[in-house]
């Protein structure tokens, strides 16, 4: 069974507002003023999609916004982002991560190993292209995930919150592989 595409969107907000539109097959952007219900809409859409596609819910990804707690306490936001990023880089137990993907290479055929190495190299190249202006680059070697600068190696949590958020989004999409997927991003 393949994941159903979103063609018609029909979501109720707060039991009084109905949002309806015909969706494009590739990218759709929802815009509105603060408090207009964009985040609520995305949460409701995600829940609806998961309910309809329960067997393939791992192919439906919701990336919530990292709350603007940063204005009040930058440490909380940076910590939440860094923890989320560390999870998708290193977690070996509960979900897809870069390291679990690399470990899967051990039992893979030579052809599968080469394909995975090429995918990781493409991911690295994409991230490095985005980080080029800040003279940072990502290196993925074995179980090491490093951010390299002119002054040496940085821990992931030393990246700016914007850099961590971009890296997290790209990593989540990368971990989906070539599977048909739906990705909902709130305030990228």
Q: Could you say what each language-model-derived stretch is?
A:
Residues 48, 158-185:
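GG-anchored amphipathic helix commonly corresponding to the ABC/SMC/Rad50 NBD signature/C-loop
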Residues 1-13, 31, 40-158:
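Phosphate-coordinating catalytic segments in nucleotide- and nucleic-acid-processing enzymes
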Residues 24, 56-58, 179:
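Residue-level preference for short coil/turn positions at secondary-structure junctions
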Residues 127, 187-188:
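Conserved Walker B
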Residues 27-28:
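Conserved beta-strand position immediately N-terminal to the Walker
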Residues 12-15, 165:
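N-terminal pre-P-loop "Q-motif" helix
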Residues 19-23:
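Conserved A-loop
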Residues 34-35:
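Walker A (P-loop) phosphate-binding loop of P-loop NTPases
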């Amino acid at each position: 069974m393949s994941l159903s595409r979103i063609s018609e969107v029909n979501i109720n907000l707060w039991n009084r507002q109905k949002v309806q539109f015909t969706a494009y097959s590739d990218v759709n952007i929802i815009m509105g003023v603060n408090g207009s219900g964009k985040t609520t809409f995305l949460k409701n859409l995600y829940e609806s999609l998961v309910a309809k596609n329960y067997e393939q819910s791992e192919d439906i990804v919701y990336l919530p916004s990292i709350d603007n707690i940063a204005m009040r306490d930058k440490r909380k936001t940076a910590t939440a982002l860094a923890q989320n990023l560390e999870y998708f880089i290193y977690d070996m137990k509960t979900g897809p991560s870069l390291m679990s993907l690399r470990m899967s290479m051990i039992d893979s055929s030579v052809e599968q190993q080469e394909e995975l190495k090429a995918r990781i190299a493409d991911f690295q190249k994409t991230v490095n292209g985005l980080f080029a202006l800040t003279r940072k680059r990502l290196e993925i070697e074995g179980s090491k995930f490093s951010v390299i600068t002119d002054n040496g190696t940085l821990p992931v949590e030393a990246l700016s919150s914007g850099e961590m958020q971009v890296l997290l989004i790209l990593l989540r999409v990368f971990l989906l592989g070539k599977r048909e997927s739906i990705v909902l991003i709130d305030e990228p």
